[in-house]
Amino acid sequence: MHIIKPSWLRHSGEQKDFEVYSCHISPDGSRLATAGGDGHVRVWSTKAIFNADHPDHGKPRQLCHMSHHLGTIHSVRFSPNGRYLASGADDRVICIYQLDSNPPSHTATFGTNEPPPVENWKTHKRLVGHDSDVQDLAWSYDNSILVSVGLDSKVVVWSGHTFEKLKTIAVHQSHVKGITFDPANKFFATAGDDRHIKIFRFTPPPPNATQHDMVNNFVLETTISAPFKSSPLTTYFRRCSWSPDGNHIAAANAVNGPVSSVAIIERSRWDSEINLIGHEGPTEVCMFSPRLFHTQKPSDNATDKGSPGLVTVIASAGQDKTLSIWNTNTSRPVVILQDVASKSMSDLAWTPDGQTLFASSLDGTILAVKFEMGELGWVATAEENDKALQKYGGSRKGMGTAEDVDGLHLENHSKEGELRGAESRMGALMGDFQPEDKGKPVTTNGSRPTAKNGEANGTTEPKEKEAPKAAPAEENVEKTAERIAELKSRVQVTKDGKKRVAPLLVSSSATGLLSLPQSQLVGAKSTKTTQSDTPQTILDLSKPSHGLPRGGIAAMLLGNKRKAAAMEGEEEDELAGRRPSAGPVPILIDTPEGLEPAPLSAPAQGVVPTPEYLRPAVISPAISFSQTRLAVPKVRSHIVRPLEKGVLQGESTLDEASKVPENIVLEAKNPIRLREPAHISASKRGARLWQDYLPRAIILVTGNKHFWAAACEDGSVHTWTPAGRRLLNGIILESQPVILESREHWLLCITSVGLCHVFNIKTMSAAHPPVSLAPILDIAITSLSLEGPTPAPGVTSAHLNSVGAVVVTLSNGDGFYYSSTMYAWQRLSESWWALGSQYWNSNDSSISALSTTAVGPVTAKNINGTASSTTTTTTPDKPDTAATAEVGVSAGIIPHLERHTTSEFLLKGRAFTLQRLIKTLLSKDGFEGFESTVSVAHLENRIAGALALGAREEFRLYLFMYAKRIGAEGLRGKVEELLNCLVGGLLQQKGAPTNGGGGSGEAKGWFGKGEMLGGWERRELLKGVVLILGKFRDLQRLTVQYARILGLTADGEDEENDDNNGGGGGENGAVAEEMELEEQ
């Protein structure tokens, strides 16, 4: 062990040495940053420090110094990627510095003894958000956020990409003096003078996150107070540290009885059973070494089972001027260094290799303690560190070096797409737009307009030709300026009679162009249509044809599961107890004239109420033998349904339905006596269009611009054309219909025995055989009871989409879709995802923006600047009607079902209880990766549902969200499988037969070899996924191969440009053959 304390390593002044409050090492270990009472941040060369005893060492000692604060600087921290340096001071400001590659423009400061700067660190941002001194700073391990704490009791979260303020957390009751991050990137902890440590759970925000997006992020997980109940309030800092394996937090300024100590807090349980005792005064700071250590020297051929145990090393220091170093293998300190400074120790910093410790003191000195190999142990590899973090669902993914030049090129393209998405979203929020002519191409995010007529990128027309096109834009600007001048000159008379110019709202005076660079402005048309998280189409579901009762249609089941055998005699007692004492209530009575409705019994007051319905429908005998029984609608005297613009509206009165003259009103009247026929008619503007009579009472009606339908209480369904001509013979069903829906030429009918029928009136065929609702009503887990049927979840709605697929929702929140190809129900939404998934009821806004600005196949351009291959081209002879018809199929169904699940979930009042159960579950051993696993599974469920439904827009959106998540999680196996499935038959030569392609050109499912998947070309989907995965360096060895096929690498772009200029090249074909050999 060597202690290095150079005399020049200090913050020197003219009369004294200033206090050093903070120190930190850069991720590459080459720089030491210190902050002191002189208001300077100084950057030192660690190589010069290690060679301080060599007088012939000619390297510069101080690399740079920055004095952009107005007071004492309390904290300085490098970002984990080494790109930024942050400092916080008592002037309430946080400065973000960035290293400029250009040499410094100035020499030594005039009138001082400061050496000339070697590096050029420039102020990148100044963050203002605290009301008092900024006491400590910390970066998340993925650089996504920066958190600052201060004497104003606030915890402020800043974006690590845009440095916007994301959230201000005020949960501490006193000064906050310490902050540390979980290396698994799940939590961060803050320590304050209220004698509490607060643990916050967070999800790393995307690069374009805003304060509005983070409302439900950064949630307080727990509060720890036991080790600090009588801790002194005299310490300047309470700097805590998280162990590199994620298991423990070391908290400074704790007490164990009357003795000062360092509390070791265990993860998950969040309690402190271990205390490091040895300091004679309160501790200010403790710091874990960033590396794990082996207690024994590992052999070169040691297996995982035979490798020695791993330990962590921690250093602590405080007001007793003593530096102690511990490891988890011994109960006593490894080394104690006393009186290493004349005043209190303020901060500690380890080098990335874990072998050298730097310490700063309030006496103005900085020392380095360098250990020899084996003194602390033998440093474990970075892979072993990552392996220790995997049980918590975190690792240092994406922090390695780029795979090669192509990998770096792909990463730059990926980040450019994210940046365009962030700028596009910011432009939408700020209302940026440019006055444009309709004939002028829309420029998105400052990119060049799409080339026309085969022009190559970069070629522009002469300015003389563009002048006439700019005239309308200039006219719009002039009109806007005139309006603003008129608003500014408006005079207002106050109450006391004085005249003054009325104030003008800033937003109303916007001229359409902000004082931002043109690259940050976004076209109004593009921002309005591309920045929504949900597809910009109407919901592809039929509107409910009649109002269902609250809670849905009641359902009863005779289950398949056998109940435990009951004792003899118990069943009879239970049946006797269930019999009503007043006897059965009559529905019909037998009179000489036939069956008549039973008269209503007079109430106690003697007033007979007016019934809302005539009578219950006559129950079909088939329901007695069915295991599933749904409630049958009652027979109403009058049913009125208006048809507005081809869409059937809800039930209303005849006066309300006739208010709109264009409405066609369908009216059904049921007689009071059973022997009289029911009357049905359609009218418009009071004139009857057609009428008809039916021998049975009508209980349900539906219709659209293609046909009308009515269901009777005898189980028959009748259909008419819009002019009143009967389409089909009466369709006889097994029991009374309880739900009747229509969509275009499709008719849905669900009967009281739970059978679902779907008819195509145009082709006079059925979409599939009748299917029972029993499986989705949980009949498999319902016990077979002798006393009678068991209540089941109610059916709250049943819909048809434009291709005749059935979607059913239940009162328990579940949403189902019936697959006519698999002949089975599929659950698309359930409350399970609401509890465990981080994507519930939300989309990744960065992916929504990215899919439309970087890799979108319709409006965006490819990386090489050419138009996207899926941009539809039409000719006068053959318009592209099929493509436009397929865009809206099943649009919005999955978000609709998830919103329904949330509504039912909250309506039942179960949300709070189940959330507490999940929170308790997450704190148990073995469930550390629960949230991450469920979130990935939820995205996979969304993708499968969108693919089955044919929801084109949702499929692409969820696929890109899934690719981003599994890339961030480092799930290499899933990434490789996803890319292989997306490739399909792209690697096969043209003209070769494709297995599974069929004759339609589109192979459904992941394993097909056709060119289409989910309504998109496989090449476009593969390109989008590769661009999203391109920034994850751990996956670049895999993604670069696909990028070469798609021409996203530098060589691929050059070759494609050569092809456009007439040249030929075969590299893509060679790469394709190479990948085919690898797959084999």
From Swiss-Prot:
Gene3D superfamilies per record: YVTN repeat-like/Quinoprotein amine dehydrogenase
Region (Disordered): 430-479, 520-546, 1051-1080
Superkingdom of the source species: Eukaryota
Coiled coil: 469-496
Keywords: Chromatin regulator, Coiled coil, Nucleus, Repeat, Repressor, Transcription, Transcription regulation, WD repeat
Pfam families: Beta-prop_CAF1B_HIR1, Hira, HIRA_B
Keyword set includes Methyltransferase: no
GO terms under biological process: chromatin remodeling; DNA-templated transcription; regulation of DNA-templated transcription
Listed GO MF terms: nucleosome binding
Intervals holding WD repeats: 15-54, 68-107, 129-168, 171-210, 232-275, 278-336, 340-381
Family: Belongs to the WD repeat HIR1 family.
Role noted for this protein: Required for replication-independent chromatin assembly and for the periodic repression of histone gene transcription during the cell cycle.
Name assigned to this protein: Protein HIR1
The species this protein was found in: Chaetomium globosum (strain ATCC 6205 / CBS 148.51 / DSM 1962 / NBRC 6347 / NRRL 1970) (Soil fungus)
Gene that specifies this protein: HIR1
